[in-house]
């Protein structure tokens, strides 16, 4: 019993040591940031939101969206969201749509297409 309490205390101590910044560690972190800022000649580290999307991303946006839809073979019949598997579909419908029926609209139409 005491071993469990001691191990919990040691884990808590280890987490708190990592989470609380010390004087030495904060100086190292700030120095790294200052060096990164001087390398970029005073420009901000994070890119600004006003930058335009690269041309190649705009060109292939539809193909990227189609590939993402293909990775999710199930579709919620209520909100048309793409879902990756049956368990996720069941969980999604129960969580967001309550007592509505659980079935996949995309698979229903695919099966009917192959039956004809």
UniProtKB/Swiss-Prot annotation:
Q: Where is this region: Disordered?
A: 24-53
Q: Name one GO cellular component term.
A: extracellular region
> Chief subcellular site?
secreted
Where found, per UniProt? Answer: Secreted; Host nucleus
What GO MF annotations does this protein's record show? zinc ion binding
Using the record, list the residue span of the signal peptide; answer none if the entry has no such feature.
1-24
**What factors induce this protein?**
Expressed during multiple stages of host plant infection, including the prepenetration, early biotrophy, late biotrophy, transition and necrotrophy.
| Keywords linked to the UniProt accession | Host nucleus, Metal-binding, Secreted, Signal, Transcription, Transcription regulation, Virulence, Zinc, Zinc-finger
Comp. bias regions, Polar residues: 33-47
Zn finger region (C2H2-type) = 74-96
Q: What is this protein called?
A: Host transcription reprogramming factor 4
Can you name the source organism? Pyricularia oryzae (strain 70-15 / ATCC MYA-4617 / FGSC 8958)
Q: Which gene encodes it?
A: HTR4
